[in-house]
Amino acid sequence: MASKPSIPKGTRDFSPAEVSKRQYIIQTIKANFEKFGFQPIETPSFENSDTLMGKYGEEGDRLIFKILNSGNFFYNKSKIELPESIEELQLNSAEKITLEQRIELNKFTGKISEKALRYDLTVPFARYVVQHQSEIEFPFKRYQIQPVWRADNPQKGRFREFFQCDADVVGSKSLWQEVELVQLYDTVFTSLGLEGVTIKINNRKILSGIAEVIGASDKLIDFTVALDKLDKIGEDGVKKEMIEKGISEDALVKVQPLFNFSGTFADKIAQLSDLLSSSEEGMKGVEELKFICDNVADLGLSTAVLDLDVTLARGLNYYTGAIFEVAAPKTVAMGSIGGGGRYDDLTGIFGLKNMSGVGISFGLDRIYLVLEELQLFPETVAATSKAIFLNFGDKEALYASKAIQKLRQENIKVELYPDNVKVGKQFQYADKRLIPFAVLVGDQEINSNSYALKNLVTGEQVSVDFEGLKKTLLG
């Protein structure tokens, strides 16, 4: 007996009902992207490896899915010296291999894989901007809704294949872009009925300033990567990792105020100003934060809350200014449902210097889980038809099909049961599909140019003409 088929760990199949709910979220996000003036683009699902590698830090690079070279690459083994075993590759214990072995491993990896699945949409977007710069009008506001892949450890709300919904602006250093992106977050989540989200904000310059004043400027990346894990491993875990990365005990004493910041936004700004008074870079970050938050406060938000979180680091190498992360309402145990930030020279890695950008992303899969848990999907979001015409034979099916054709022209979702089988089986099918209405057609209906319309929820059945049928199904 053949084994039961399955899907790879960290991936999912979606039922018609699930797809309808996902499309509801996507269409809501897309409509608001366009309302704010963003234009759509798409990029390939895989990129050249050198486009992606080295852009996400050491931890991010480890999570990139590599694609083996295709075709008859391995048939001609004389061209490549294959390792004899997995142990020889040392893939799962890279820290144990020597520099020489690492160099050989990198050479081998380069021979068997030159492409990789995209890790996010931001780096491919930077590549797109550089490649198509002569065709683009700057500032360029783009949105992109496509899947990405990460070789992560699957858990609740974390998958190896998932969609990102990104909006970015490149070609402008204006902080009004950040103000608008905060408003965009608020508008989208309000449209989805998800009230009480917290938009956390920080600034990479503030983190650089903190590293400077505690004497750990040379450990900035290690410092931010560890700090970004505060919600996962707690204060003690963060301090332990910092020490392991070579950050001194004295530096940890100086950084202690970070873990105790509290009060209003103004209070936090005052505490930051005291801590960073000797850092020009840090104070610049404070001023940028103040500009964004003051203007957002003047404009107002509908349902979201903007909060200054000085421990927010987002362990990605390319952020240079504002950093965003969106937390679900406190009633739901879920990680971030969005994030982003300012990147002043991301396109510089591809040769286009001084092209500042800022962008945000919506986590479709986690937003889905939150809406499902809070029962916020509208009842109108359904993959099913509004009505099914029962089949009593070819003559009746033809009469029904003429009505179906006209109803579909009115954008009403209807269908004909394909087979002339027992009526009980047809009703059972409609019930399992959660179709709310059934239309019955016999000689009496054909002769009187009418339709028997049955409400499958209440059991009520009435005779209607076509206009009455259309009005009910449109309601």
From Swiss-Prot:
Keywords: Aminoacyl-tRNA synthetase, ATP-binding, Cytoplasm, Ligase, Nucleotide-binding, Protein biosynthesis. One of its GO terms (cellular component) is cytoplasm. InterPro entries: aa-tRNA-synth_II, aa-tRNA-synth_II/BPL/LPL, Anticodon-bd, Anticodon-bd_dom_sf, His-tRNA-ligase, HisRS-like_core, HisRS/HisZ, HisRS_anticodon. GO terms for molecular function: ATP binding; histidine-tRNA ligase activity. Its EC number is 6.1.1.21. One of its GO terms (biological process) is histidyl-tRNA aminoacylation. It is found in: Cytoplasm. The keyword Cytoplasm applies. It catalyses: tRNA(His) + L-histidine + ATP = L-histidyl-tRNA(His) + AMP + diphosphate + H(+). Pfam families: HGTP_anticodon, tRNA-synt_His. Its main location: cytoplasm. The keyword Nucleotide-binding applies. Belongs to the class-II aminoacyl-tRNA synthetase family. Homodimer. PANTHER family: HISTIDINE--TRNA LIGASE (PTHR11476:SF7), HISTIDYL-TRNA SYNTHETASE (PTHR11476). This is Histidine--tRNA ligase. The lineage of its organism: Bacteria, Pseudomonadati, Bacteroidota, Flavobacteriia, Flavobacteriales.
